[in-house]
Amino acid sequence: MELLHSGKVRDVYADGDDLILVASDRVSVYDVVLPTPIPEKGKLLTALSLWWFDQLAELVPNHVLSATDVPVELAGRAIRCRRLEMVPVECVARGYLVGGGFAEYQRTGVVSGIELPRGMVEAAALPEPIFTPSTKAPVGEHDQPMTFGEVVDKVGAETAERLRQITLDVYRRGAELAADRGILIADTKIELGWAADGTLTVGDELLTSDSSRFWPAESYQPGRAQFSYDKQYVRDWATRSGWDRRSPAPEVPDEVVDATRARYVDVYERLTGERWG
């Protein structure tokens, strides 16, 4: 296998006509990779992605060829995939006002060019899910919000509309399935690319704790920060630590590592109904 790309969290290898996508235990916050891994994180993300790819297979095609035809040393954290020509846009759907979207709303009253009702509080449910794309920045740089018009300028009107529709369809169906299991999906990011036949196809990961914000429905209360089954716990620690959000990042304390892993395990078990390990 030939290493093609090493990203913040995933490594991509070429294996003949296919790709081998490997999820590491690395964790990134504020677009910087932290020096401390989260044990089994890569396997948890891979298992949850595969579950979602299966759940949403009739809604949108995905890049998975096999989860078992991979090198034995990578079993559980690698997927054999078809090659895609990736779209140069991060496709994000939001159902709740949180994170960077809430910060932008506080400053301007809009999110990615979409005007929202006045007086909304942190974590408020949006009137309907919205498409809030961003640029794809290199490792170490920050993604920047885009308006839909900017996406049109980058990829054309027809493709931009398809990106928006697929992203929102995936979010709505994912949110519906998660709600049945007591989980709210606040927002999610998906990667889309063109397959060899020109079909827009989901790649990378899907609806995981790295690409989404998951909240327990039973404790949801707008107007405050939510308990989150994702890397928000690490983000919060990084914010409190006094780190300037530039490399090199500090080591993550053991208690933060353990609590983060527990959240990844909990949401996997709640969503899939399967025991981890």
UniProtKB/Swiss-Prot annotation:
Protein name: Phosphoribosylaminoimidazole-succinocarboxamide synthase
Pfam families: SAICAR_synt
MF term (GO), any: ATP binding
Keyword list, A-Z: ATP-binding, Ligase, Nucleotide-binding, Purine biosynthesis
Membership in a protein family: Belongs to the SAICAR synthetase family.
Keyword Nucleotide-binding annotated: yes
Catalytic activity of the protein: 5-amino-1-(5-phospho-D-ribosyl)imidazole-4-carboxylate + L-aspartate + ATP = (2S)-2-[5-amino-1-(5-phospho-beta-D-ribosyl)imidazole-4-carboxamido]succinate + ADP + phosphate + 2 H(+)
GO CC annotations, alphabetized: cytoplasm
InterPro entries according to UniProt: SAICAR_synt/ADE2_N (IPR028923), SAICAR_synth (IPR001636)
This protein's encoding gene: purC
Gene Ontology process terms (BP): 'de novo' IMP biosynthetic process
PANTHER family according to UniProt: PHOSPHORIBOSYLAMINOIMIDAZOLE-SUCCINOCARBOXAMIDE SYNTHASE
The keyword Mitochondrion is annotated on this UniProt entry: no
